[in-house]
Amino acid sequence: MEIIKITPRGYCYGVVDAMVIARNASLDKTLPRPIYILGMIVHNKHVTDAFESDGIITLDGPNRLEILEQIETGTVIFTAHGVSPEVKRRAKEKGLVCIDATCPDVENTHTLIRRKKADGYHVIYIGKKGHPEPEGAVGVAPDIVHLVENKQDIEQLPESLNDQKLIVTNQTTMSQWDVKHLMEDLEEKFPHIEVHKEICLATQVRQEAVANQAPSADVLIVVGDPKSNNSNRLAQVSKEIAHTEAYRISDISELKLEWLEGKSTIAVTAGASTPTPIVKEVIDYIKGYDPLNITPIPETSGVPVDKILPKIKNAAPVKILD
């Protein structure tokens, strides 16, 4: 069986930066305890479990402000997905020490929204409802940001927006093809709209790699957490653009033998928040797959927790929000 290891795949710089920030926080004895992460630092349960073993508590839920109310004292880390100004204000009001691990690409979108609001614009934001990144972006200026996820949402936007200065931007981890189609629909409805595509480069090149390399495979395995939007989009790109069957799995335990049976070429990629050892475990199993002598798929991943987080040789001081 041939294996195509899609390149690039796995960790992006924003994820690595966020994990290093949280790891440094766990090693900084001057920070008040407990240390909480407001949501999943990145969307991967293996990573959040590893931080739990490091003494950092992950609090997750659909709304950052509601989660924040569970915290009375200590330190709070904002995740790579970004948070609204209201969350930051409330955390300071509660007397919490705040550390910001927002991805720079997400922060760029927040800056764009702030700037356009100051210039009198309304913003149409393409994103996945219920995902923390749109929650934070909409929260930058909730009075002028309109969240849309699909064509039906666009149809429901008021015609009165034609009388407003208008831009469209997007969640950084969306499918670039979905965003393109939705932006075209918006340009048709609002001909004067300014287009600001904000798909991050890491997401873009990983999607393009799948589009270009997956057609050579019989099936694509995407290793990524179910909450990881960029992982789910990789599977979508494989099916819709590369026309290759695709399955997303969290780790080796979710791999199915029937996906491998009768196949000659298997491609493997990974979401931007998937630990490299978790991906390697999947690749190693597929490499060793023998239809005449099948090794049972493990019920759980065998990757030790201490192999998940980045190694910190010299802990750096943690930058605390003013």
UniProtKB/Swiss-Prot annotation:
Q: What reaction gets catalysed by this protein? A: isopentenyl diphosphate + 2 oxidized [2Fe-2S]-[ferredoxin] + H2O = (2E)-4-hydroxy-3-methylbut-2-enyl diphosphate + 2 reduced [2Fe-2S]-[ferredoxin] + 2 H(+); dimethylallyl diphosphate + 2 oxidized [2Fe-2S]-[ferredoxin] + H2O = (2E)-4-hydroxy-3-methylbut-2-enyl diphosphate + 2 reduced [2Fe-2S]-[ferredoxin] + 2 H(+)
- Give the annotated active site: 133 (proton donor)
Q: What is its EC number?
A: 1.17.7.4
The residues listed in the UniProt record as binding (2E)-4-hydroxy-3-methylbut-2-enyl diphosphate, with positions renumbered to this chain, are 43, 81, 131, 172, 228, 230, 273
* GO MF terms, alphabetically ordered: 4 iron, 4 sulfur cluster binding; 4-hydroxy-3-methylbut-2-enyl diphosphate reductase activity; metal ion binding
What keywords is this UniProt entry annotated with?
Answer: 4Fe-4S, Iron, Iron-sulfur, Isoprene biosynthesis, Metal-binding, Oxidoreductase
**Cofactor(s) essential for the protein:** [4Fe-4S] cluster
Q: Which domain of life is it from?
A: Bacteria
**Oxidoreductase found in the keyword field:** yes
Write out the residues that bind dimethylallyl diphosphate.
Answer: 43, 81, 131, 228, 230, 273
Listed binding positions for [4Fe-4S] cluster are 12, 103, 200
- Cofactor note (record): Binds 1 [4Fe-4S] cluster per subunit.
Which Gene Ontology terms describe the biological processes this protein takes part in?
A: dimethylallyl diphosphate biosynthetic process; isopentenyl diphosphate biosynthetic process, methylerythritol 4-phosphate pathway; terpenoid biosynthetic process
In its keyword annotation, does this UniProt entry include Heme? no
Q: What class of enzyme is it?
A: oxidoreductase
Pathway it acts in? Isoprenoid biosynthesis; dimethylallyl diphosphate biosynthesis; dimethylallyl diphosphate from (2E)-4-hydroxy-3-methylbutenyl diphosphate: step 1/1; Isoprenoid biosynthesis; isopentenyl diphosphate biosynthesis via DXP pathway; isopentenyl diphosphate from 1-deoxy-D-xylulose 5-phosphate: step 6/6
Family annotation (Gene3D superfamilies)? 3.40.50.11270, 4-hydroxy-3-methylbut-2-enyl diphosphate reductase, catalytic domain
- Residues recorded as binding isopentenyl diphosphate, renumbered to this chain, are 43, 81, 131, 228, 230, 273
PANTHER family membership: 4-HYDROXY-3-METHYLBUT-2-ENYL DIPHOSPHATE REDUCTASE
Which family does this protein fall into? Belongs to the IspH family.
Per its database record, what is this protein's job? Answer: Catalyzes the conversion of 1-hydroxy-2-methyl-2-(E)-butenyl 4-diphosphate (HMBPP) into a mixture of isopentenyl diphosphate (IPP) and dimethylallyl diphosphate (DMAPP). Acts in the terminal step of the DOXP/MEP pathway for isoprenoid precursor biosynthesis.
* Protein name (database record): 4-hydroxy-3-methylbut-2-enyl diphosphate reductase
Write down the species. Macrococcus caseolyticus (strain JCSC5402) (Macrococcoides caseolyticum)
